[in-house]
Amino acid sequence: MTTEIISFNLGVTSCYFIIGKEIVMIDAGMPNKLQRFKKILSKNKIDPARIKLIVLTHSHFDHCGSASEIRDLTGAKIAIHKSERECVEHDRVLVPKGVNFRGKITQPLIFSFKIPFPKFTPDIFLNNDPYPLSEFGIDGQIIHTPGHTIGSVSVILNSGEAFVGCMAHNGFPFRLKPGLPIYAQDIGAIKENWKVLIDRGTTFVYPGHGKAFPIEVIKNQLKYPSTN
């Protein structure tokens, strides 16, 4: 199956359309971004009804802030890992630690902000088993990749693209160049999950913040930790 990838920003967050027979959207950006989202649809000549699934890589407000409004517009189902259900239905925030110098310095400031977003009940609760995307005409699956948060997930395509949320950063204020995240609940788990993605043939990384980059960046950081 042939797929097309469209990247766009909703606030500081990098979101993506994976276009097959239908469209799967990765992350829903900051709160109050519905009008910008409509402009993105218009610019790319996308019928909102083609978007059938919104995959939330995790429950932080900058990744799920406009999910409820976008679901209302498109009729798409929202999928999130079951361990983060409370975070989007209520007001629980999973706070990761700073894992390098920049992360430790900025973490208290970044996570002192608690921007409200419309709470919602997701339609699909992912577990630790892969969730295939074949019903949308896309050769790929959603897999559980905990580390940034306990319920973080990634979307991997058979063609080598990996949409990883905050398993990687590539943009201000997080990193000035691509690489491993500067915040994580368990950086060891992130590194192990990167090994899984590499073993599964990942060639290109689509992060939750910043532009896509080749997997060689991550391979080098795993091999030479001092470069992180």
Named regions from a protein language model:
Residues 1-44, 154-170:
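Conserved beta-strand hairpin/beta-sheet module of binuclear metal-dependent hydrolase folds
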Residues 35, 59, 64-66, 150, ...:
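Short N-terminal helix/helix-N-cap motif within the alpha/beta-hydrolase-1
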Residues 8, 18, 129-136:
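Short acidic-hydrophobic surface loop/beta-edge motif
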Residues 94-99, 181, 223-225:
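Short, hinge-like loop/turn segments at secondary-structure boundaries
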Residues 42-125:
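Active-site HxH/HxHxD metal-binding segment of metal-dependent hydrolases
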Residues 31-32, 117-118, 130, 139-146, ...:
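Metallo-beta-lactamase
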Residues 24-26, 55, 78, 161-163, ...:
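Residue-level marker for buried hydrophobic side chains located in beta-strands
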